[in-house]
UniProtKB/Swiss-Prot annotation:
Domain UVR positions: 633-668
Motif Beta-hairpin: chain residues: 92-115
Protein's name in the database: UvrABC system protein B
Record's function text: The UvrABC repair system catalyzes the recognition and processing of DNA lesions. A damage recognition complex composed of 2 UvrA and 2 UvrB subunits scans DNA for abnormalities. Upon binding of the UvrA(2)B(2) complex to a putative damaged site, the DNA wraps around one UvrB monomer. DNA wrap is dependent on ATP binding by UvrB and probably causes local melting of the DNA helix, facilitating insertion of UvrB beta-hairpin between the DNA strands. Then UvrB probes one DNA strand for the presence of a lesion.
Keywords in alphabetical order: ATP-binding, Cytoplasm, DNA damage, DNA excision, DNA repair, Excision nuclease, Nucleotide-binding, SOS response
Encoding gene (name): uvrB
Residue intervals passing through the bilayer: none
Residue stretches making up the Helicase C-terminal domain: 431-597
Family: Belongs to the UvrB family.
C-alpha cells in the first residue's frame, strides 16, 4: 500500500536551502541522533524538511507546540505530499476537565470532556497509516507523549476479512462488538454497523467517506465492496479488508480478565495500608469506586475512566512508561521538533503537572496507586524513545544546541532575498509620540504595525491613546481565545485596522507579510518577555516585508538586546552578501490570506479523496475580497443554482454551507454597489 514519497512543489531549493538539506541528510545517514536547523522566519524551513523526507524516504513524525501550528504544518505537508499519507494527531478534546480533588474544600470534580469526532477519526487514521505504510508523515502536538493503546494489543484485535473466507455472521458481529463498534440499523455513522439479511455494512472508525459492505452466502464471505455511506453507491470491489478497533484502548477479553485479578490484588493491599493509617473513609470510598469499575469491566469490557487501569491492561510493571504514539513509529523513523525552543520545555512540563493532581486522588482514596502510571512520558523517557531528531527553530534553546554539540545547520538566506529587519534603538522618554509618527507613516502606505508592551495596563492605555489620535488599532490579550485571536490576525492582514498592540506577540510561525514595523516598548527591562530569544522572535515578525524594521525603545542596551541585535546583524550581513553575489533583489511575499481556522475546524475535509456523487458540488472557500460588483453578481447566481441542486439531492449540510457563503457575498455586493 506504501508509495515512495513524492514531493509536489513548483519551487526548487534556493538560498541556504540546498546546503541545509545536504547537511541534514548527511547527518542522518551518518547516524547523528540530534541535529538543529536554525531557520530564520520566512526561510522555508518546512520546505527544507519536506525535501529531507522525500530524499531519505523515511516515515516521519513532526511535533508542533500547539493545535494551531499543527494545523498550519498539516496543510503545508499535505500540499507537499498529496499522494502520500499525511496525518494529523492532536488531542481530540474540545473541552477537558480532568477528575480532581481539592482537600481544602473537600470538593471532588468529576472528569468531564467533549470529544471532537473529526479529530478522533484523524487520530485513528494516523495510527492505521503508521502501522500499514512507510510513506507517512504524522503532524502531532505534544498529545503524542500521552498514553495510547498498546500497538501489539491493537494489532491483535484487528478483524481481517477476505473473499472466500469461512466465517458465520454471528462471529463477525461478535468480533465487531469486541472492537467496540455499535449496531445501528437506523443511523449509519462512523464506528457503527448495520445488518440486512446476509449483508453487513460497516463504517470504519478511521474513515470519513468510505464504508465496507460484506456480502455473505451461507458461512462464506462472497463479496467485499467499498461504498459511499451517503449515497450507497459502490465505489470498488476488493479482495480483502482489515477492520481496525473503534478506539485505541480496546483490549482482548482474556487480558481484561487477567487485569481484573491484578486490580483486586492491588485493591486488597491498598485497603490494608489505608486501614493501618486509620483512613476509614478513604478505604470505604476506594473499595466502592473500584468494585463498581470492576463490575462494569466484567459486564461490558470497559468502564468510565478505564485509562486509570491502563498499566494492568497493557501488562506493564509499576513505573514503566505508557505506550504512546512513539511506539507506532518504526525504528528508522524520523522526528522533527518544530519551534523546538517552545516544544521541548512543554514536553518536560507535562509529567509534573499530571503527577501532582493524581497524587491527591490516590492519597484521598479516589484512585488506586496504579493510576499514577496513566500519565504522559517523563522527559527522560521521551529522550529514550525518540528516534533520530531534527530540532527546527529560529531561536534554538540551550537543550537543542547542547544535544547537537553546537553544530547548527544555518538557514539564514531566504529564497525571496528578503533581509532581516533593520534595528534601531530609541530613547524611552519619547517612545509613545515617536511610535505615533511611525504608525502614521506606515498606515499611509498600507503597511501594518505590531507593538509589544510589558504589561496589560500599558497595552490598554496605549490602545486608548492611539484610538484618541485617530489610528485604527486593536488590542490582543490573554483573555481572547484562539479562534478570536486568529480572526484578529486575519483582519490585520486584510487591512481592517493598521496597528495591533499586545504583550506577547512573538507567536512562533505566524506569517504576516504586511507587517513592516515591530515596535518593542521598554526593551531594556530584562525578563522573559525581553530575553534574547523573545526579542529575536518578535523582531522576526517584520522579516517578511521588504521594508521590515524593528524599533527597540530603551535607555540602555541590555545583554539580551546586544545579543539579539548582534544575531540579527549577523544574519542580515550574510543575506546581503548572498544577494550581491547572486544578483538577487529582495521581493516581498504576496501570500494570500488563508483562514487557518477553516483548516483547523474542517481539517478532516481535506482528507477526502473523492466521493463519487456524494462529493459536494462546491467546496466552501474564502470569499474573494477584490471582486467587482458584476463578478459578485455572477458568483451569487452560480451559487444559488448549486444550493438548489444540493437541496434537491437531499444534501442539506452542503446547501447550508453555500447559504452562509451567499450571505457574505450579498453583503459584499451591497457594500461594493
Amino acid at each position: 500500500m506504501s508509495k515512495p514519497f513524492k514531493l509536489n512543489s513548483a519551487f526548487k531549493p534556493s538560498g541556504d536551502q540546498p546546503e541545509a538539506i545536504r547537511r541534514l541528510e548527511e547527518g542522518l545517514e551518518d547516524g547523528l541522533a540530534h541535529q538543529t536547523l536554525l531557520g530564520v522566519t520566512g526561510s522555508g524551513k518546512t520546505f527544507t524538511i519536506a525535501n529531507v523526507i522525500a530524499d531519505l524516504q523515511r516515515p516521519t513524525m513532526v511535533l508542533a507546540p500547539n493545535k494551531t501550528l499543527a494545523a498550519q504544518l498539516y496543510g503545508e505537508m499535505k500540499e507537499f505530499f498529496p499522494e502520500n499519507a499525511v496525518e494529523y494527531f492532536v488531542s481530540y478534546y474540545d473541552y477537558y476537565q480532568p477528575e480532581a480533588y481539592v482537600p481544602s474544600s473537600d470538593t471532588f470534580i468529576e472528569k468531564d470532556a467533549s470529544v471532537n469526532e473529526h479529530i478522533e477519526q484523524m487520530r485513528l487514521s494516523a495510527t492505521k497509516a503508521m502501522l500499514e505504510r512507510r510513506d507517512v508523515v504524522v503532524v502531532a502536538s505534544v498529545s503524542a507523549i500521552y498514553g495510547l493503546g498498546d500497538p501489539d494489543l491493537y494489532l491483535k484485535m484487528m478483524l481481517h476479512l477476505t473473499v472466500g473466507m469461512i466465517i458465520d455472521q454471528r462471529a463477525i458481529l461478535r468480533r465487531l462488538a469486541e472492537l467496540q463498534y455499535a449496531r445501528n440499523d437506523q443511523a449509519f455513522q462512523r464506528g457503527t454497523f448495520r445488518v440486512r439479511g446476509e449483508v453487513i455494512d460497516i463504517f470504519p472508525a478511521e474513515s470519513d467517506d468510505i464504508a465496507l459492505r460484506v456480502x455473505l452466502f451461507d458461512e462464506e464471505v462472497e463479496r467485499l465492496s467499498l461504498f459511499d455511506p451517503l449515497t450507497g453507491q459502490i465505489v470498488s470491489t476488493i479482495p480483502r479488508f482489515t477492520i481496525y478497533p473503534k478506539t485505541h484502548y480496546v483490549t482482548p477479553r482474556e487480558r481484561i480478565v487477567q487485569a481484573m485479578e491484578e486490580i483486586k490484588e492491588e485493591l486488597a493491599a491498598r485497603r490494608k495500608v489505608l486501614l493501618e493509617n486509620n483512613k476509614l473513609m478513604e478505604e470505604q470510598r476506594l473499595t466502592q469506586r473500584t468494585q463498581f469499575d470492576l463490575e462494569m469491566m466484567n459486564e461490558l469490557g470497559y468502564c468510565s475512566g478505564i485509562e486509570n487501569y491502563s498499566r494492568f491492561l497493557s501488562g506493564r510493571g509499576p513505573g514503566e512508561p505508557p505506550p504512546t504514539l512513539f511506539d507506532y513509529l518504526p525504528a528508522d523513523g524520523l522526528l522533527v521538533v518544530d519551534e523546538s525552543h517552545v516544544t521541548i520545555p512543554q514536553i518536560g512540563g507535562m509529567y509534573r503537572g499530571d503527577r501532582a493532581r493524581k497524587e491527591t486522588l490516590v492519597e484521598y482514596g479516589f484512585r488506586l496507586p496504579s493510576a499514577l502510571d496513566n500519565r504522559p512520558l517523563k522527559f527522560e523517557e521521551f529522550e529514550a524513545l525518540a528516534p533520530q531528531t531534527i530540532y527546527v527553530s529560529a531561536t534554538p534553546g540551550n537543550y537543542e544546541l547542547e544535544k547537537s554539540g553546537g553544530d547548527v545547520v544555518d538557514q539564514v538566506v531566504r529564497p525571496t532575498g528578503l533581509l532581516d529587519p533593520i534595528i534601531e534603538v530609541r530613547p524611552v522618554a519619547t517612545q509613545v509620540d515617536d511610535l505615533l509618527s511611525e504608525i502614521r507613516q506606515r498606515a499611509a502606505i498600507n503597511e501594518r504595525v505590531l507593538v509589544t508592551t510589558l504589561t496589560k495596563r500599558m497595552a490598554e492605555d496605549l490602545t486608548e491613546y492611539l484610538e484618541e489620535h485617530g489610528e485604527r488599532v486593536r488590542y490582543l490579550h490573554s483573555d481572547i481565545d484562539t479562534v478570536e485571536r486568529m480572526e484578529i490576525i486575519r483582519d490585520l492582514r486584510l487591512g481592517e485596522f493598521d496597528v495591533l498592540v499586545g504583550i506577547n506577540l512573538l507567536r512562533e510561525g505566524l506569517d504576516m507579510p504586511e507587517v513592516s514595523l515591530v515596535a518593542i516598548l521598554d526593551a531594556d527591562k530584562e525578563g522573559f518577555l525581553r530575553s534574547e530569544r523573545s526579542l529575536i522572535q518578535t523582531i522576526g515578525r517584520a522579516a517578511r516585508n521588504v521594508n521590515g524594521k524593528a524599533i527597540l525603545y530603551g535607555d540602555k542596551i541590555t545583554p539580551s538586546m546586544a545579543k539579539a541585535i548582534g544575531e540579527t546583524e549577523r544574519r542580515r550581513e550574510k543575506q546581503q552578501k548572498y544577494n550581491e553575489e547572486h544578483g538577487i533583489t529582495p521581493q516581498g511575499l504576496n501570500k494570500k490570506v488563508v483562514d487557518i481556522l477553516a483548516l483547523g475546524q474542517n481539517i478532516a475535509k481535506t482528507k477526502a479523496k473523492g466521493r463519487g456523487k456524494s462529493r459536494p458540488i462546491v467546496e466552501p472557500d474564502n470569499v474573494p475580497m477584490d471582486m467587482s460588483p458584476k463578478a459578485l453578481q455572477q458568483k451569487i447566481h452560480e451559487l444559488e443554482g448549486l444550493m438548489m441542486q444540493h437541496a434537491q439531492n437531499l444534501e442539506f449540510e452542503e446547501a447550508a454551507q453555500i447559504r452562509d457563503q451567499l450571505h457574505q457575498l450579498r453583503e459584499l455586493f451591497i457594500a461594493a454597489s
